């Protein structure tokens, strides 16, 4: 690993530690836009760098910080509320003993909540559940970035192998052209064999250029995601392979999207309780000391009182808020079912695609073996004038089609495996990024 890579890994680990400890706005280094050249990289390193750069991670981390601040705001309801107050201007009080004209007043007041039938506690619990939902959404964002990066990585590997196979096919066609030239020079075949082969080579060169352009595009996309341009990309880890019938063993309780929806449902339930508690009174202690400046004399007014605020009739506003909260809870509950449904659908489709790609890959492998055997036989028979140049070119086309089909099927399979692992929130552990369940955030090594 290069010095640049070590530095970036350290920076990313530090950034995640900051989020875990402070739950505040995130990575100061995620705004980097530069792309650094490196000799080689792996899928794990690419994902780590992408998470360090992706703005969506910082965005969701900031949302988590907002959630924590909302908890602090709700908890402040139990703290004493202290304020200074003052006024100036004409004020007159008249009673049986006469009139008192005040010109100014100032003082200090304090209010302490005693009991509110769950209003404040439910608000705290509601904000806590919402904060936990934001935490799981952050986990989901990390998984989404990992999936996006892994799919881009697979595309780079796909076009790297296709380009290499196309170049090998060009070289094979050049060997055929050389053989045709030798036979033409010896007078045992016409020069049209060589010309026909050159035409086929030109067509294959166009395919090479096409895959070169596709590879450059894939490398550019991955470079923007990771912030580095590697000369070599390691193979996709084999442990990403999808197990048969694994879709029937999905543990939804460990999937961030489901857990985020469940916590939003829990938050909505506390919202219902908060709305219902508005029917009940609020008991508080109020105290104050106020100085009045009057024409006749100045004096202090001290007070300490137990205050009760009990709603009697508000035009149905509280009942309407309860119904709104119950509707929000029903919506949140449906989101839990939707999250499970989305996970199952994505995982099921990915598993089916994986199985299909494995089958196509095996068929391509068998086709390639047959084409390679036919190539050797046809070359020998061509030198003995038992085969035409068209037979030789046809078998080279068969070799190319089998090779490209095998490569395409292989990387279609890896894309499906990545989609499956992301659906069940197992992508990062499979590539070596361990997750700390207690902290509910990835612990990157």
Language-model features and meaning:
Residues 2, 141-254, 350-353, 357, ...:
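Periplasmic alpha-helical coiled-coil/stalk elements that build and connect Gram-negative outer-membrane
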Residues 59-74, 141, 145-168, 175, ...:
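Amphipathic alpha-helical coiled-coil segments
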Residues 42, 81-141, 259-340, 346:
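Small/polar-residue-enriched beta-strand and adjacent coil segments characteristic
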Residues 28-83, 226-269, 273, 312, ...:
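Bacterial Sec-pathway N-terminal export signals of envelope proteins
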Residues 13-24:
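Bacterial N-terminal signal peptides
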Residues 89, 95, 101-102, 206-209, ...:
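Outer-membrane beta-barrel domain signature
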Residues 2-4, 8, 27, 35-36, ...:
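Acidic, low-complexity, intrinsically disordered peripheral segments
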């Amino acid at each position: 690993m290069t010095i640049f890579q070590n530095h970036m890994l350290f920076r990313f680990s530090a950034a995640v530690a900051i989020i875990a400890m402070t739950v505040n706005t995130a990575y100061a280094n995620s705004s980097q836009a530069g792309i650094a050249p490196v000799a080689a990289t792996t899928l794990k390193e690419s994902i780590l760098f992408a998470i360090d750069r992706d703005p969506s991670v910082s965005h969701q981390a900031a949302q988590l910080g907002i959630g924590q601040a909302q908890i602090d705001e709700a908890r402040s309801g139990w703290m004493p509320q202290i304020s200074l107050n003052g006024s100036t201007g004409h004020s007159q009080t008249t009673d049986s003993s006469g009139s008192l004209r005040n010109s100014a007043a100032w003082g200090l007041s304090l209010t302490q909540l005693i009991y509110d039938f769950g209003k404040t506690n439910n608000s705290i619990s509601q904000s806590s559940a919402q904060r936990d939902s934001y935490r799981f959404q952050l986990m989901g964002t990390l998984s989404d970035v990992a999936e996006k990066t892994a799919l881009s990585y697979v595309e780079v590997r796909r076009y790297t192998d296709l380009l290499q196979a196309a170049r090998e096919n060009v070289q094979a066609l050049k060997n055929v052209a050389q053989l045709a030239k030798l036979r033409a020079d010896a007078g045992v075949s016409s020069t049209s064999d060589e010309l026909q082969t050159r035409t086929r080579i030109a067509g294959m060169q166009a395919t090479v250029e096409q895959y070169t352009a596709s590879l450059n595009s894939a490398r550019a996309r991955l470079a923007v995601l990771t912030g580095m341009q590697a000369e070599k990309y390691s193979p996709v880890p084999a442990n990403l392979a999808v197990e048969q019938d694994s879709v029937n063993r999905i543990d939804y309780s460990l999937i961030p999207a489901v857990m985020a929806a469940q916590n939003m449902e829990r938050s909505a339930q506390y919202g219902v309780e908060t709305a219902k508690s508005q029917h009940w009174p609020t008991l508080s202690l109020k105290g104050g000391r106020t100085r009045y400046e009057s024409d006749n004399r100045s004096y202090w007014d001290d007070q300490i009182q137990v205050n009760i605020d009990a709603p009697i009739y508000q035009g149905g506003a509280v009942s309407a808020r309860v119904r709104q909260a119950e509707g929000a809870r029903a919506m949140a509950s449906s989101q839990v079912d939707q999250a499970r449904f989305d996970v199952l659908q994505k995982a099921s489709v990915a598993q089916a695609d994986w199985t299909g790609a494995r089958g196509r890959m095996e068929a391509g492998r068998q086709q390639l073996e047959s084409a390679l055997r036919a190539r050797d036989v046809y070359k020998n028979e061509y030198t003995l004038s038992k085969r035409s140049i068209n037979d030789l070119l046809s078998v080279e086309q068969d070799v190319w089609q089998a090779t490209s089909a095998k490569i395409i099927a292989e990387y279609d399979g890896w894309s499906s495996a990545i989609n499956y692992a992301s659906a069940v929130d197992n992508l990062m552990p499979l590539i070596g990024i361990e997750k700390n369940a207690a902290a509910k955030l990835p612990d990157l090594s």
